[in-house]
Amino acid sequence: MKTLLVFDFDHTIINDNSDTWIVQCVPGKKLPNGLQNSYEKGKWTEYMGRVFSYLGEQGIREEDMKRIMIAIPYTPGMTDLLHFIGQNKDSFDCIIISDSNTIFIDWILTHANVHNVFDKVFTNPAAFDSVGNLTVQNFHVHHCTTCPTNLCKKKVLEEFVAKQSSNSAHYSKIVYVGDGGNDLCPVTFLKKGDIAMPRAGYTLDKHIAKDVTLVDSTISVWSTGAEILSHLKLLLEH
């Protein structure tokens, strides 16, 4: 049986937040205060929709955005890790569950030639409209009270594993790699024998450190892709 690898995107695969990185397109690299202050807790995707509308009003086009986005740095050691996974697809299935959007993730993965590593990317659907403005929608509707309105990562993970099982694709273990507060919910889905890998010093790591009883799986903290790579090599040896 294969191991399922689940990755967050922002501050995990890449070493920044793709949504806030796009602000570099704006003259002065700063959004108007009114727009910045319009964010409501749990409604980040709606907020980003307003940001993208503003970018369109400023005459910022697809090619401008793409040029900025492909310059975003990968987390140290992450491209080596992804190439290793790509070379061992007989042992690993690999998915992304992210609060970013389809356009940004596709640009960034394709530029580094690592898009084929991932079997599936679950994120907010985005597209350029008829006048060239970027639009984004919520990924799905859910009833989780702890997750933002656009995406419950636990629900996505549960449904993916169930669908795979129905197609006779069962996993020996799940490894979840993430950093943020919204990665806690899916980590609670993990069972004994699975591995939760929170990024050191980030929100997920802090949540788990406060109460390890939240998680049934093994916990392995990481700082660079090299540490995750070492862990995966050990899995292959056993």
Swiss-Prot record:
Root EC class: hydrolase
Entry binding sites for Mg(2+): D8, D10, D179
Pfam families: Put_Phosphatase (PF06888)
The keyword Metal-binding appears for this protein: yes
One GO MF term attached to the UniProt entry: phosphatase activity
Swiss-Prot/TrEMBL cofactor(s): Mg(2+)
Signal peptide: none
Disulfide-linked positions: none
Annotated positions binding substrate: D19, D99
EC number: 3.1.3.-
Function comment: Probable phosphatase.
Name of the protein in question: Probable phosphatase phospho2
Species assigned in the record: Xenopus tropicalis
